[in-house]
Every structure is written in C-alpha cells, then in structure tokens.
C-alpha cells in the first residue's frame, strides 16, 4: 500500500484480515526525501493492527533517537510492537538493532527458540560507542530542544524564501529532518515525490556544493541537522540558497 494511504491499508485488511502478519513502515518517510505522516495515518495503522492481531513494525533507523529520545513513537504518541534501529545508536559506528514487546522478544534466544547470531553481532567497539551516545542523550535532553529550534530556523527559512521568491517548491520537514522537493505538487507519498524535477535539484546541489554547503546528492534523500550545527551556519546556508534562487528567478 502507498505511504499515507490508510484507505488502501484498510482494503488490504478487509481482504486478508488476520492473515496479515505485520505492517512494516517508516513512521516518517525518510527514504524518498522526507514525507511526514498524514494526520491519523499512524494511529489508523495502530488500530488496524490491534484489531486484526497483526504486528505494527516501525523502521526507526533514521527517526530513532533523532526526533526524540523515544524516537517517532514518542514524537507522535504511537507505540509499535517491534522497532528497528541503526545510525544514531552506534555513536558513529556501524550497528543495527531491534526491540519490542516483551512477549515477542522472549521468543528469541537465549530465552526463546528462535536463534539469531552474526559474526559481528555485539561488536564491542560499536557497543561501547553506542552506549556512550545513548547515555549522553539521556543526560542531555536539551539536545532535542536545540535540534527542534535548528529545524524551525532552517526549514522555516526555506519556506519563507520560497514564498518571497514565488518558488513553486515543497518544503517537508519533521524536527531536524527536512527536504526541498522541486515540484509544485504537495509531496505525501512516493508517487508525488517522483514528480520532482531532478535536473533542477542537480543544478541547485552543484551550486550549494561549490559554495561550501554539502547536501545529500539525491533529491530523494533527507537533510539532517546535527546538534553540532549553529544558528550562524543555518543562516549562512539560507543566504547561499537565497543567492542561488534569486539568480535562478532572474535568469528565468
């Protein structure tokens, strides 16, 4: 089913009911740019899964420990049954993890009968780095206040820029995650994201790179703000963006 299309998911449940083992979803679509969930979308998925005895599985590799200490589940107030994690939990080291309800996790060894192992599982260097990272976030909740403020400053500034210059582009953002889609169409799913002008994005990316701002090189990747970023750096980024788009408008 398409992201943000609760009706399509409902039709699948009408057809298959409890035969659906799980619904797997990014709570914020972050691998097609950034696509926030529509109002009641995640809540609707939670309701359908509960009613049919299906698992709700959140892919929080990107949103986990970024939107909030409790990830998107804390941010939106929706609890998943299982969750996958990566990126931030490694403190800069490669790591992946999953977790969830006790009754599900107890099916996995050594408590349960489902065996899971890997040559690099529990790598001590990655575990030490990740544990240090999570302890820091636990002790410094102000990190999230700072990230939210940076997000509002950058993405709000981009929205203002588009309004002032009458640019027909879409600024999608949730917390410190954001994306400028080079399309007139509101972006709510993969299909609408694909309506973006990738050639226009490529020209924008090249200009920003030439002026010292290294963005993700694909229209369909998210922008990530870090606690290390400053208001001054955000303002510099917005200034360079303005210079580019003012030139673009003049040359149109």
Question: What is each of the regions a protein language model found here?
Answer:
Residues 1-252:
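Conserved N-terminal phosphate-binding loop of PLP-dependent enzymes in the Aspartate aminotransferase
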């Amino acid at each position: 089913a398409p992201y943000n299309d609760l009706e399509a998911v409902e039709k699948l449940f009408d057809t298959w009911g409890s035969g659906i083992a799980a619904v797997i979803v990014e709570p914020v679509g972050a691998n097609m740019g950034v696509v926030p969930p529509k109002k009641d979308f995640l809540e609707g998925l939670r309701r359908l899964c509960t009613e049919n005895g299906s698992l709700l599985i959140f892919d929080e590799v990107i949103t986990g420990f970024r939107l909030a200490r409790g990830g998107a589940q804390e941010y939106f107030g929706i609890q998943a049954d299982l969750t996958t994690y990566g990126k931030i939990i490694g403190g800069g080291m490669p790591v992946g993890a999953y977790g969830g309800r006790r009754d599900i996790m107890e099916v996995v060894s050594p408590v349960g009968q489902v065996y899971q192992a890997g040559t690099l599982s529990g790598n001590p260097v990655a575990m030490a780095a990740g544990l240090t990272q999570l302890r820091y976030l636990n002790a410094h909740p102000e990190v999230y206040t700072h990230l939210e403020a940076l997000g509002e400053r950058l993405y709000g500034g981009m929205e203002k820029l588009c309004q002032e210059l009458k640019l027909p582009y879409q600024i999608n953002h949730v917390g410190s995650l954001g994306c400028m889609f080079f399309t007139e169409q509101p972006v709510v799913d993969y299909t609408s994201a694909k309506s973006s002008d990738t050639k226009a994005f490529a020209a924008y990316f090249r200009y920003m790179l030439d002026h010292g701002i290294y963005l993700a090189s694909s229209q369909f990747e998210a922008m990530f703000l870090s606690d290390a970023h400053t208001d001054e750096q955000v303002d510099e980024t917005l200034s360079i963006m303005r210079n580019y788009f003012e030139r673009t408008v003049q040359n149109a």
